[in-house]
Amino acid sequence: MNQVIAAHGWAGDAMVWRAWQQRFEALGWHWDAVERGYGQREPHQPSWAELPGQRLVIAHSLGLHLLPETVLQQADAVVSLAGFAAFVPAGAAGRALGVALKGMASCLGTSDEPAMLRKFLSRCASPLPLSALPNNPLLRGMHPSGRQRLQDDLVLLQHCRSLPGGWPEGASVLVVQGEQDAIVCPESRTQLLQALPPSRTDHRLRPDEGHAVVTPAVLDLVVRWAGNP
């Protein structure tokens, strides 16, 4: 049986994959997903079942860096949706991002937290309105343990510099990027492509989409690609 393990990004949760899970399960795939537990859901780190068949990782944004190395290294194929090797690139763009991340970190656990999260999620949704995204439970508050995980992952976001540990060198890779992404800067998008082997990498640039490339059209694209990665 073919398997999928999916990973959401910073300030997300596994419910973002609900339509994706339904689609892949209807096609006979086994589905599991990372849950970091920022909000009310319990954390969960998935693992591959001992089954024959294809092992496909689908990761949105920071999700590529949140997967256990043992999961990533056993993948036959990887789909990166608005992902990156280094979120903060060298140079002026990186300096500006570093300042922004420190500002976000300073808001966590304060009265400024809801506004910071709402601004971040609005940038994720852009060029669409925030209402185009599923309701995010973080806007209703967090437990201290979930906030700490969010803080830890913000540090990871600032310091990741390369493809994550356990990267499967022989895997086929699909990179989907939104040309209007307001979260991942163009330099970081380019660096990801430079870090991947061209002969095994399929790059799709979506001119009308932003950071939240977990749309029905992208789901259709990924399902087609997974049939012949």
Describe every region a protein language model picked out.
Residues 169, 175-177, 181:
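Short beta-strand/loop motif that positions the catalytic acidic residue
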Residues 179-184, 211-212:
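Acidic catalytic loop of the alpha/beta-hydrolase fold
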